[in-house]
């Protein structure tokens, strides 16, 4: 059992027969009354997200999640296909369950598949990935690193803010936890 006050982003727990992943969690102490935990959660099985509050002392059954190394194969319609790199088993995951993760991976990228028992529930991507800029505004002569930056569209469709000197065709290192530019590759 885990208390609501100990839940953090990325953790998974069971509540009312549902498997829930924490997207955001924060403590709030109103002027009057008791502390509450505000959370943005996702039902792992349906993909629906919702906001809720809990008392910090509420307890939940923490879900035991196992991971296996895998490779992203391709996406077709509403399904993403992955292959276990040890057993060569293939897994189909609804795109709605891995929508954010697909912004950071290309076909044949290495990932980790998350299992709850024998059920595939999600994908973990590396902390940083290298992606190519497909579209951005032209560089401005004399632009410096301290500028405010400009938006750049990457090969997966992800849009990140980059320094002014970045041009289309360059490979960038992207932080997957925050969705931000780190450096040129």
From Swiss-Prot:
Domain of life according to the entry: Bacteria
Record's function text: Involved in peptide bond synthesis. Stimulates efficient translation and peptide-bond synthesis on native or reconstituted 70S ribosomes in vitro. Probably functions indirectly by altering the affinity of the ribosome for aminoacyl-tRNA, thus increasing their reactivity as acceptors for peptidyl transferase.
Similarity comment: family membership: Belongs to the elongation factor P family.
Gene Ontology biological process terms, A to Z: peptide biosynthetic process
UniProt-listed SMART domains: EFP, Elong-fact-P_C
Keyword vocabulary terms for this entry: Cytoplasm, Elongation factor, Protein biosynthesis
Compartment(s) where it occurs, according to its Swiss-Prot or TrEMBL record: Cytoplasm
HAMAP family the record matches: EF_P
A Pfam family the protein falls into: EFP_N
GO CC term (a single one): cytoplasm
Protein name per its UniProtKB record: Elongation factor P
GO MF: translation elongation factor activity
InterPro entries: Elong-fact-P_C, NA-bd_OB-fold, Rib_uL2_dom2, Transl_elong_fac_P/YeiP, Transl_elong_KOW-like, Transl_elong_P/YeiP_cen, Transl_elong_P/YeiP_CS, Transl_elongation_fac_P
Annotated metabolic or biological route of this protein: Protein biosynthesis; polypeptide chain elongation
């Amino acid at each position: 059992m885990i208390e609501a006050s100990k839940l953090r982003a990325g953790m998974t727990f069971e509540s009312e027969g549902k498997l829930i992943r924490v997207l955001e969690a924060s403590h709030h102490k109103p002027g009057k009354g008791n502390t509450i935990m505000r959370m943005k959660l996702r039902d792992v099985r349906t993909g629906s997200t919702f906001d809720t509050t809990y008392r910090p002392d509420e307890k939940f059954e923490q879900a035991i999640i196992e991971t296996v190394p895998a490779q992203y194969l391709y996406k077709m319609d509403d399904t993403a296909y992955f292959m276990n790199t040890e057993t060569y088993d293939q897994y189909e995951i609804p795109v709605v369950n891995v929508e954010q993760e697909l912004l950071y991976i290309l076909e044949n990228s290495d990932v980790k598949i998350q299992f709850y028992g024998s059920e595939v529930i999600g994908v973990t991507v590396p902390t940083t990935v290298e992606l190519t800029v497909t579209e951005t505004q032209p560089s401005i002569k004399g632009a410096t690193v301290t500028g405010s930056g400009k938006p750049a569209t990457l090969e997966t469709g992800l849009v990140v803010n980059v320094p002014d000197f970045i041009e289309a065709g360059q490979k960038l290192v992207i932080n997957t936890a925050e969705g931000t530019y780190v450096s040129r590759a």
